[in-house]
Regions:
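Glycoside hydrolase catalytic-domain context in secreted enzymes
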Residues: 1-673, 679-694, 701-703, 710-715
C-alpha cells in the first residue's frame, strides 16, 4: 500500500475511529475500523512462547483447548548459546507460533541489561554485556519478523529492576546510558529493523519512559530513525499530553476501563478543545497503518503460521543443547560413567518451569531432567529419585489477576522463610536424610538445585543470592554422602555457589531451557552432547561484590543511583581485579581447544583479525572464540576489557580452522559526554582473544594516534 493510500484512509476516519486505534480495546488488542477494512491489532506476551488465551476484559484464562504452544528457552538460555543461528531459530519458532495463534505483535524480546543478580526479570533478558545482547537480539528479531509477525523489543529503557518499577527514577549518566543501556535497542532498530518497541515503566530524567521525549523523540526517532510503532508497557502511561506529544503510538493497560485510558476519551477531549492538534493522532494512526501494511494485514496475502510442530520442537532441543554451561569438571567426572543405579536428587529434577509473570505460557509438554535421564537410559540403569527439598509454603504471586494488582505497587520481595512449624522442620530434615542416603548408596548422583518462578518472576526482585528452601544444607549433606555428586543448577540469574563450588567436582548450569530442556540436560550429562554454552553474565562470590550493590544502589528508593556508571558486571570485576566465582563468557567442554597464530590487519573500516583454533581432544565440540578490546587509558578511564566480537566454531577431533573476525572502529570508542558523540581517543589498545574474559589466550596491541587517519571520530 502506498503512503498516499494510507493518508487517504486516515482522512476518511472520524476522530473516534482514530482514538480506537491508538489504545487498548481489550487486554491484548486495539480496535479496528471495519468499514474501511482495517482490522484490530492483536498482541501477546511471548518471551518463552505465545501466552495462553485470556478473557477480553480481564486476566482470567479463556479455558480453551487450542492454545497449547511450544515452550521456548528463556532469553538468558538463548544468550548462553553464544550462537546467532540459535537465536534466529528461536525467533522463527516464536514468529510462526504467534501467527498460528492469530497474533500480529509478539511482545519480545526483552533486552534490558542485567545490572544486578537480584532483578526478577533477568531470565527474560540476555546479558550484562551490550555487545552480546545486540548480537543475539538482532537475529532473534529478524527470525520473528520473517513470519509476518512484528517483534516488540522491550523495555525501552533502563528497566533493570522490578522493585517500585512503575515509578522509580533510573539515575544514570549519559556515558553509561550510551555505552551500556542503549546499544541493544539501537541494534534492534538499525540492524534488526524491529517494527515495534515497548516503553518501560520507570522514569528517566523526570519523565516516564513510555512518554519520555528524550528517549522516544530525540534518540529513538531522531537519532536512530525509527519509523515503527511505540507501544506502552501495560499501565505505563501517566500523562495524556506527554503521551500525545512525545512519540507514543499505542497505550495498553491492565484494567478494563479502556475508554478512560490517557489516550482514549481524555485525549479525544483535549483534541476537541484544541489543546492537542489532531495531526498528532494522524501521525500515530499512520505509524500503525504502515505496520499493518508491512505485516500484510491490509492486503490479505499473509503467512498463516503454525504451532507445536515437530520442526519447532527439534529447533528448541538444538537450542537447549547449546545453552547448557559446564562450569566445572574436575577429574573428568562428566560425562557420567555407565552404572547400575543413578541417584537423581532435588525438586528441580522433576519441576516444570514454563511460567513466570508475563512469560507464563500453556506448554504442550515439558521434559524435566528426571524424565530426560529415564528416556535416555531406558531400562539399563535404575534411575532413583529423592526430592531432597520442597518448595511448598513460599509466598506466590502467580495468580490470575496479578498483573492488574501489580499497579498497586505491592511491597513483595521474592524470599523464602518456610512455614516454621515443627512438622515442616521435621519433614525438611527427613527429605535431606533420604537424599543423602540415596546418594551414598549409588555410585553416580546428580543433585538438581537452583531457583524457580517464585524467584525468577516479573513484579518482584530477590532479596539475596542465596538458594531458597534450605538447599545449602541439602547440598552439604549430599556431598558428604557422595563426593562425586554432580551439581546441576537451574536459574535465570546468578546464585550464590560458595557453599559447594569448591567441594563439588562437577557443576552444570542451565537457565529455563524450554520444553526439551530436560532431555538436553540428560544428553549433556551422559555425553551424548558435548556442552558448548557460555555464561552471559558473571557469577560473583558475594552479592556485595556486585557493583550495583557496592558502588551504586539496588533497589534504592524513589530514585536509584547508577553510580557505577560504565563499570557493570565483568567491566567492574576485571578493572578492579576482583575475584569472582565464574567469570563472564566461561564454559567448559568435554574436549580441549588450543589457540595460535593471531594476526591483525589495519584497514580503512577497522581492524581485521584471524586466529587459528584447534580441537586437541578426542571428541567433536564447539568453541566460542571471544574477542575483547582494552584501552591503556592514557587519556580516558576505560574498563579493562570489553567484549567486541565472538565466533562459535564446530570442530572435529584434531581439526584446525582459521577463525576470522572484524573490529570496526567503533569497537575502540567511548562516549564523550562533552562532545555528545562516540570517539576513538589516541591510546594503545589490546586485542584479546580467548575462551572467556578471564581466560585470554592471545593478545596483540594496536596503536591509534590522534592524527591517525583511522582514529579520531568513530565511524
Amino acid at each position: 500500500m502506498t503512503m498516499q493510500k494510507i493518508w487517504d484512509l486516515i482522512r476518511e476516519m472520524t476522530l473516534e475511529e482514530k482514538i480506537g486505534m491508538i489504545h487498548g480495546q481489550g487486554i491484548f488488542h486495539t480496535k479496528g475500523v471495519e468499514r474501511l477494512g482495517i482490522p484490530p491489532l492483536w498482541m501477546s506476551d511471548g518471551p518463552m512462547g505465545v501466552r495462553k488465551e485470556l478473557q477480553d476484559d480481564n486476566w482470567a484464562p479463556k479455558g480453551t483447548t487450542d492454545d497449547y504452544v511450544s515452550y521456548l528457552p528463556s532469553n538468558t538460555a538463548i544468550a548462553c548459546t553464544w550462537n546467532r543461528e540459535r537465536a534466529a531459530d528461536m525467533g522463527c519458532v516464536l514468529g510462526q507460533e504467534a501467527r498460528g495463534r492469530g497474533k500480529d505483535v509478539i511482545l519480545a524480546p526483552g533486552i534490558n541489561l542485567i545490572r544486578s543478580p537480584l532483578c526478577g526479570r533477568n531470565f527474560e533478558y540476555m546479558s550484562e554485556d551490550p555487545h552480546l545482547i545486540s548480537e543475539m537480539a538482532v537475529p532473534l528479531i529478524r527470525g520473528i519478523e520473517e513470519q509476518d509477525t512484528a517483534a516488540c523489543v522491550k523495555h525501552f529503557a533502563l528497566n533493570n529492576q522490578e522493585t517500585r518499577r512503575l515509578d522509580v527514577e533510573a539515575a544514570v549518566d549519559e556515558r553509561a546510558l550510551r555505552e551500556l543501556y542503549l546499544p541493544g535497542f539501537e541494534a534492534a532498530v538499525k540492524e534488526g529493523k524491529t517494527k515495534t518497541l515497548m516503553g518501560a515503566y520507570n522514569r528517566f530524567r523526570g519523565e516516564h519512559c513510555c512518554h519520555n521525549h528524550y528517549l522516544l523523540q530525540d534518540i529513538l526517532r531522531g537519532e536512530w530513525g525509527f519509523d515503527g510503532v511505540v507501544i506502552s508497557d501495560w499501565g505505563g502511561v501517566h500523562d495524556t499530553m506527554q503521551a500525545a506529544e512525545n512519540g507514543l503510538d499505542i497505550e495498553m493497560s491492565v484494567t478494563s476501563d479502556f475508554d478512560q485510558y490517557c489516550m482514549a476519551d481524555p485525549l479525544a477531549e483535549r483534541v476537541r478543545s484544541g489543546d492537542i492538534p489532531e495531526a498528532l493522532l494522524d501521525e500515530k494512526v499512520k505509524n500503525i497503518l504502515v505496520l499493518m501494511d508491512r505485516l500484510h494485514m491490509l492486503d490479505g496475502v499473509r503467512k498463516r503460521g503454525s504451532y507445536n510442530t515437530r520442526d519447532h520442537q527439534e529447533a528448541i532441543l538444538k537450542c537447549a543443547e547449546e545453552a547448557i554451561v559446564l562450569l566445572k569438571n574436575e577429574g573428568g567426572i562428566l560425562p557420567l560413567k555407565p552404572v547400575k543405579r543413578l541417584a537423581v536428587i532435588g525438586e528441580n529434577a522433576g519441576k516444570m518451569h514454563s511460567g513466570g509473570g508475563s512469560a507464563a505460557i500453556k506448554a504442550l509438554y515439558e521434559l524435566t531432567p528426571l524424565m530426560g535421564l529415564k528416556m535416555e537410559l531406558g531400562g539399563a540403569v535404575s534411575v532413583e529419585y529423592a526430592p531432597g527439598y520442597q518448595s511448598d509454603g513460599e509466598k506466590s504471586v502467580e495468580q490470575e489477576n496479578w498483573q492488574a494488582e501489580s499497579l498497586e505497587e505491592r511491597a513483595y520481595k521474592a524470599s523464602y522463610k518456610g512455614d516454621g512449624s515443627d512438622a515442616a522442620e521435621k519433614r525438611r530434615r527427613e527429605l535431606i536424610r533420604e537424599a543423602a542416603a540415596l546418594a551414598e548408596s549409588c555410585e553416580n548422583a546428580v543433585l538438581f538445585i537452583g531457583l524457580n518462578h517464585e524467584f525468577d518472576l516479573e513484579g518482584c526482585d530477590r532479596t539475596d543470592m542465596k538458594l531458597p528452601y534450605g538447599q545449602e544444607e541439602l547440598i552439604s549433606a549430599v556431598l558428604d554422602a557422595n563426593e562425586n555428586t554432580v551439581i546441576a543448577v537451574t536459574a535465570g540469574s546468578p546464585v550464590d555457589m560458595e557453599v559447594f563450588a569448591d567441594r563439588a567436582k562437577a557443576i552444570v548450569y542451565s537457565s529455563y531451557n524450554g520444553m526439551e530442556g530436560g532431555l538436553a540436560m540428560a544428553e549433556v550429562l551422559l555425553g551424548r552432547v558435548n556442552p558448548s554454552g557460555r555464561l552471559p553474565f558473571t557469577i560473583p562470590k558475594r552479592l556485595e561484590d556486585c557493583q550495583a550493590h557496592s558502588i551504586g544502589e539496588f533497589p534504592g528508593g524513589d530514585s536509584v543511583a547508577y553510580r557505577e556508571s560504565v563499570y557493570v558486571g565483568y567491566r567492574y570485576y576485571e578493572t578492579e581485579r576482583k575475584a569472582v566465582r565464574y567469570c563472564f563468557g566461561h564454559g567448559l567442554s568435554y574436549t580441549e581447544f588450543s589457540y595460535g597464530d593471531l594476526k591483525l590487519e589495519r584497514r580503512e573500516d577497522g581492524i581485521y583479525g584471524t586466529v587459528t583454533v584447534r580441537n586437541c581432544g578426542s571428541v567433536a565440540g564447539a568453541e566460542v572464540v571471544e574477542i575483547y578490546v582494552g584501552a591503556a587509558g592514557k587519556t580516558v578511564k576505560r574498563p579493562a576489557r570489553e567484549l567486541k566480537g565472538f565466533v562459535k566454531v564446530h570442530l572435529q577431533p584434531g581439526e584446525e580452522r582459521a577463525v576470522d573476525f572484524r573490529l570496526p572502529w567503533k569497537a575502540f570508542s567511548y562516549y564523550n559526554e562533552e562532545k555528545m558523540t562516540f570517539e576513538v581517543p589516541e591510546d594503545e589498545y589490546s586485542v584479546c582473544v580467548g575462551r572467556s574474559v578471564g581466560d585470554v589466550r592471545l593478545v596483540q596491541t594496536v596503536e591509534i594516534k590522534e592524527n591517525d587517519a583511522l582514529g579520531g571520530k568513530s565511524r
